[in-house]
């Protein structure tokens, strides 16, 4: 990890992913968690304020970068939310099989290198009746927008810490062995369309 990725990028992402339209998206999904909850890619803690309105039990925040947790821990204290930090990758979650009620992932599936492996891990750690709650940006349905996503993706990925603009989120979740209880999608307002097509909902293991 270079200096940019270690010290600069986390704060850029904290600002970008904390915009009002994205914050409204977070507010839609985070309160739906319940029981033992594992947040994948807790990052700088942008979801933390919304746990107060949920039925969360034990809360675990997983992230590969301890630098993010330095920011997230401040947010945690400000909101009086108890969260255990776990430094690990989404592709290899150090949690036993069938041990969590909810897996929450927001604006993170775009970045995980081996996303198929990570989704298998989500499925592995969930209890039999557990749920995957997600809110992600991804491939747009409009051909012209998708073309721009494909063109911009290489440089975007390099500058934004591995973020991909053009992943098909519903397809990835479905192919990973989940079925949707709820799936919504739209361009979020006040956001460039190439980065602003959102998918969010709830899925359960097939």
Where do the model's predicted regions map?
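A short acidic, Gly/Pro-enriched loop at the edge of an enzyme's catalytic core
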Residues: 88-103
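Conserved beta-strand signature within the Rossmann-like core of class I S-adenosyl-L-methionine
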Residues: 129-137
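Core SAM-dependent methyltransferase catalytic element
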Residues: 178, 185-206
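Short alpha-helix
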Residues: 161-177
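Class I SAM-dependent methyltransferase SAM/SAH-binding core
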Residues: 38-92
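Conserved alpha-helix/loop element of class I SAM-dependent methyltransferases that forms part
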Residues: 16-36, 46-50
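A short SAM/SAH-binding and catalytic strip from SAM-dependent methyltransferases
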Residues: 101-115
């Amino acid at each position: 990890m270079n200096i940019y990725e270690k010290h600069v990028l986390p704060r850029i992402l904290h600002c970008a992913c904390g915009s009002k339209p994205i914050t409204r998206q977070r507010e839609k999904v985070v309160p739906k968690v319940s029981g033992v909850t594992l947040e994948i890619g807790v990052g700088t803690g942008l979801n933390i304020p919304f746990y107060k309105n949920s039925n969360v039990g034990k809360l675990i925040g997983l992230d590969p970068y301890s630098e993010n947790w330095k920011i997230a821990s401040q947010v945690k204290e400000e909101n009086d939310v108890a969260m255990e930090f776990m430094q690990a990758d989404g592709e290899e979650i150090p949690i036993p099989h069938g041990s969590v009620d909810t897996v929450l992932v927001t604006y993170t599936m775009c970045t995980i290198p081996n996303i198929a492996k990570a989704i298998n891990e989500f499925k592995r750690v969930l209890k039999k009746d557990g749920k995957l709650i997600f809110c992600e940006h991804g491939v747009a349905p409009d051909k012209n927008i998708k073309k721009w996503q494909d063109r911009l993706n290489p440089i975007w990925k390099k500058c934004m810490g591995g973020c991909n603009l053009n992943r098909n989120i519903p397809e990835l979740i479905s192919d990973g062995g989940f079925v949707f209880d709820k799936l919504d999608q739209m361009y979020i307002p006040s956001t460039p369309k190439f980065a602003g097509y959102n998918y969010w909902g709830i899925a359960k293991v097939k």
